[in-house]
Amino acid sequence: MAKFSYKTVTRKILADLYTPVGVYMRLRDIYPQSALMESSDYHGSENSRSFIGVHPLASIAVSHGEVIKTYPDGRVEKEQLSAFGAGQGEECKLAISKSINDFISSFHVEGESKEFCGLYGFTTFNAVRYFENIPVKDTTMEKNDAPDIYYIMYKDIIVFDHFNNTMELIALQESEDPHSSLPELDELLKAVNKANVKPYDFHPVGETTSTLTDEEHKANIRRCIQHCLRGDVFQIVVSRRFVQKYEGDDFKLYRALRSINPSPYLFYFDFGGFRIFGSSPETHNRIVGNKAFIDPIAGTTRRTGDMEQDRKAAEFLRNDPKENAEHVMLVDLARNDLSRNCHGVKVDFYKDMQFYSHVIHLVSRVSGELDEHADHIKEFIDTFPAGTLSGAPKVRAMQIISELEPHNRGTYGGCIGFIGLNGDLNQAIVIRTFISRNGELWFQAGSGVVAKSNDEYELEECNNKLGALTKAIHIAEEL
């Protein structure tokens, strides 16, 4: 296998005159298929960075049972997963993790800030078709949908360190000449400093529609309650999709969303034919060195805007028997998921209240030490998808979801984020997210249904989770 060796060339400047959004707006027309990743959590140095990736250099995708790899020299490799002897389940997990690991190992990067060079992209919820015996609907509506798994390696990365107030431009150079990438950095910096940036308008067209009516969704909730009462599952996360037509620039919608619903994971990925952007509060899986983390969110209530009312709502949420039972169940599921590749699994914090623009969430953190020979990609796959977006037990819950929901989920409930060449990774759950394609926005929300659930309450929870998205649509048009 060809080995692509690079050395980083970097330039660091003060960032007080720049913002990630402002820089991205200057670059996106010059460098197509770029990506912006931000975090609103600037309280400590570990979460205080934002990233812009430009110049796609290589990529790996899994789609319709085929692994597709593109390399810097223009080569494209395609191989059916069946060629690995893989159908579904453990064999397929191993085949996909091996493909990703082999792809990563074909790159060698040295130099300052090399830890930011890696794969940026997503794993859709539909990828469960490879990992378990889950029938995923492939309807006409989804024929132009994204690959099941898609990650890109960018040639140039811009890193904003909000803690130290710096902006670093990083370029990958092939030759031994330390000056070979300097003209490229000069061009990038020139684009960053471009004086005029014209923001474009955004206009929703018509009313927001859903693939399910309120009554149809409540009927699905009642079916889930019956499955819980029969003992088929303890919990099912059932969802519904919404569609909004629009004209104009969807990046303005991202700007509106990030302004009203700042979250640990803010992202805008342009993949050419479609874009994924959102404001996710939830870490699915993070690996730093030899430690792995899952941060389950289970338990949600609406914010009123009144501090005293919100305090009472948070206290009620913390003590509500139904919400607590659900939270305990999903923390245990996270512990079990990590235990497949980790030892010393423990709960770092439990039932922490986190306040967002429209909702209050109940959050815990579970961590573990990776086993000595653990495969980091396999560890991620073994935790996928999040129990908070599927249910418990996971496999049976996903089978019921596939039966009840009228379409496949696409990226909703999957993951988006970074896989480092050194094995570190950081993946957010794709919630509070828009998929934009051909003048249409798709967005989705759900709720965790247990035996004691009430269909009206679960419908309200689903609508509460949509609050930030629907408000962002209105603000993007007005401002």
Segments the model singles out, each with a brief description of its role:
Residues 1-479:
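Extended alpha-helical targeting/anchoring segments
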